[in-house]
């Protein structure tokens, strides 16, 4: 594997940023990163005999050594980011693309044929601070490209799964967000595992009550509507995933680095997550609602 990376960034220090915002300046921080990857081979582990030997550990035989097989993958990943500050308004956006090809895709495709990579993901998030930074109103919209390849027999969690490209399909388009980027509490976080083949819209609001001496309690809530970019790869072959509402209460003490809280979420699935009778005559079912209660606490040090 050969990987090369180049980047350009412009980020103000926290002190300078605070001073410029207080003066009413329009502040823009930005970054550009490009990553090039070239992988010649991949390793296919060979099946070995796990039977214990009465003579102790033995040297590997030639037929037990991992097998190096051709992969010949090349990709270029551009990543553009910027964050704008103007008085009480903050707008942040990031866009990522993956472009390249794999000459020998192996298990990624049903045929040993060159496949193209063309994937993209993006997020735009805004926040407006009101009432002396006590009331926050936000809106976030994001998306990740999807692919028409589907496998209704698999679980839906894309944090670990992949769908093999069928014969005649020589391109991969499904982009996956990092599973550590949490948009909600239920659908993307636990059902899908990450954001992929989706566009979502998320308005949110929170209010913080100052308790003095660096302590505060916040009440927050958000609503997320999500839809598929490529409906044919959803279980229900439809566009609407569903609507989720999340509310929570958080306590924080910035002086001592202590925080904790509780969050409750409720998700109402739509047609894209059901299994309609027209597609599954012997195994059709309507998706049901889901809810979650999450308690968290931590110490920063």
Segments predicted by a language model, with ranges:
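Signature for the C-terminal beta-barrel architecture of outer-membrane proteins
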Residues: 1-151, 201-203, 208-219, 223-231, ...
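Predominantly the C-terminal beta-signal and adjacent terminal strand-loop region
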Residues: 254-295, 300
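Surface-exposed loop/turn segments flanking beta-strands in extracellular/periplasmic regions
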Residues: 51-60, 161-171, 177, 281-283
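Flexible glycine-rich, low-complexity coil/linker segments exposed to the extracellular/periplasmic environment
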Residues: 152-195
